Amino acid sequence: MTFTSLRALHALIGTAIDDMERVYHACSPDLDYPSIDKPYYKAAQHTPEEELAESLASDEAVAAAAKRIVAACGHLSHTVNKPWFGLVEDVHGGITAECIRFMETANIVEILREAGPEGLHVDSLLKQILELRPKARNAAVGDGPLTPAHLGHILRLLATSHYLREVKPNVFANNRVSSYIDSGKSVAYLREAPDKKYTDTDGVAASVGITYVVLSLVSVGDDQKTKKTKKTWAAPFNIAFDTPLEYFPWLELPGNEARLTRFGHGMTGTRQWEAKNFILQGFDWADLPEGSVLIDVGGGIGGTSIIVAEAHPHLRVVVEDREPVVSAAISAWGPRYAPLFESGRMSYRARDFFRAPWDPLTLRDGRTVTAPSVFMLRLILHDWSDDDSRRILTRLRAAARPETKLLVGDLLLPFACRDDADADTSASPSPAAEPSFAPDGSPLLPNLGKGNVHGYLLDIMMMGMFNAREKTTAEMSALLLSAGWKVTDVRRTPGNLWGYTTAVPV
């Protein structure tokens, strides 16, 4: 029985902790296990108590108990975790490896060691990273594809995976795990003799190795393909596939037909990011008047909006996407949804939102729609840089009526720390406030750490494919406002990164 197994695993963890504690207390009644939040630099001076606590972590009995805890936690988490989240974490696990290698190659551990336990803001951290790149010492922050915002998102994935600490929003510090790959060299030494970083070390830092997809972001001054550009087509994806095309035009090239078909069906699979049919709770669809029109912008084959069309027959849903996608959309669904298409309750229109302003459309019932009731952008903005996203949003804003709503469906990534700016409970929280998913007083990270790491992995994947990223709620609010939209509501299920953000014209 599953509950019996879960309780057995829970008990095993407790017993193993007891075994570890006995070893520590046999040496000293007050001796504690090393904290993950406190770095342990091998080249530094330590108190006798710190040295003993660290050495006991390798004691045979302690190590065996620790291994049982890791095994039980892994078994427990895979048993209760939603299979989709587990798959995403494992399929994209290489992204975490790339980010660890980036952290090592960019000398972030050494920079943060000298910054101390208070940590360093990403603005200052990026400046020091660039100063340690021989060909980039005169480059200004933001002169290449790696910006402070990108750096913050990379390090937030690592903090969410417990490889760093985010002590305040966008301020990061080392922890016990990151300190393990410290070379022991000073930043000044690395500036003068970068080729000797691994000399006279235990080889741990050197073993981390090198990767290209994320490292290309830090190659400002080294790689002319990515220098001085923030265009989507300058993403590492373009280097990997040796193409100047953006991802979606590349997907439509002859020879990529199977990839294009797979992508369309894969977007239907992205329903798994949210609670089942959460799109129906993400907006007050029933409050819209009879005949209201929902435009699903860049909606692919309509994998999410078709749920709305089926549940709310008083609405008319129009999915807009590029011609190759739209032409295959209806046939992709088979006979099940034929009544929706035959009645005109759901239809498709070929449109590239970059090529022209949004123009009126004529429905099957003869009505001309000059502006819809709702524009929906689901998993769209995370595909584009902020500049390109602003172009999309500005065009929709120009087509909107005062009563038009914008609904954005995307992952909204909390910080890996508590945000004191949102801790004031004397006033109603802003819709853009960063939530804390952890219970009060819990040692869990506010974003639930490994329980939500899948979203932070996707964040870095978007960076590598599109020079884009997932956003915090504050970043989303600022982006929408810059294009003439004000956030009025954010809906998400407890502990889930997925959110539907509603905005109105301003």
Predicted regions and their residues:
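Short, contiguous, pocket-lining structural segments
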Residues: 255, 259, 267-271, 296-300, ...
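N-terminal auxiliary segments of SAM/dcSAM-dependent transferases
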Residues: 4-73, 80, 148-266
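Conserved alpha-helix/loop element of class I SAM-dependent methyltransferases that forms part
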Residues: 269-293, 307
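Conserved SAM-binding loop and adjacent beta-strand
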Residues: 98-100, 260-279
